[in-house]
């Protein structure tokens, strides 16, 4: 068995804690519940040229929920290079488990939509074509098209999730279409919207679940995140989850290394698991029902 490389923070973990090197859940178990399609749109710069954006989706009415009811749509923005792994992108974006019965029942049913960036690697191996501001309108238009043609206009609320680069895109989407979305769940980004934009969030009763680890390898908490926390705390509807350590389901502190350590950046993994350890213990005591509990509360409040 290959010996795992110790992460650079290994000597800082609490006494009695241990490190594990992969999530405890299986990937792909629910991929068959998702469909894949393609959205065609025109670019601003090349009005005569059509572009395509692939996407995955899940329809709750195919899995026991009544067809004549309205449901929210949960949009999941994947991270950098995740479009290059095929169907695994469903999992990496944090969407797969939202097709599970327990998640769907917790929120009363929800459509799931995963837009896919047209990423590729250049001759030097660098990822190009990932999410940026040029994708904001196409993603918005995809959501509108999906709501009309896939959900028959029966969409109640719109919630956008994002992981890493997708979390930055998550903020940018709501910044641009603040009166369109009802909630956002950015995971693993320091690109928090400015104060004036957060004021617009409050004016539109936007709910925000902000999640970033204090030891995120790509987003320095002390210099980039901590200065923005007081402003987030003043928002009308903001839950802040900034754990000291990111854990796997077995209570092990998470380490992931694909040439660079990123275990503490990959908060998407426990968020995908509803912030629950495998033994049913909540990772965040103030969220006894996990992320789906927060989503359920948000949806009920928005319906009131």
Residue locations for each model-derived region?
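A domain-start/cap signature at the N-terminus of enzymes
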Residues: 1-72, 163, 168, 227-228, ...
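Gly/Ser-rich "nucleophile elbow"/oxyanion-hole loop immediately N-terminal to the catalytic nucleophile
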Residues: 64-65, 69, 124-164
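Short, solvent-exposed loop/turn and secondary-structure capping segments
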Residues: 67-69, 84-90, 124-128, 172-173, ...
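Alpha/beta-hydrolase fold active-site loops
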Residues: 72, 110, 157, 207
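Active-site machinery of serine-nucleophile hydrolases
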Residues: 73, 77-137
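Short, proline-enriched alpha-helix->beta-strand connector loops that line the catalytic pocket
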Residues: 108, 201-208
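Primarily recognizes the serine-hydrolase "nucleophile elbow" in alpha/beta-hydrolase
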Residues: 155-202
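C-terminal catalytic histidine-bearing segment of alpha/beta-hydrolase fold enzymes
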Residues: 209-218, 223, 233-304
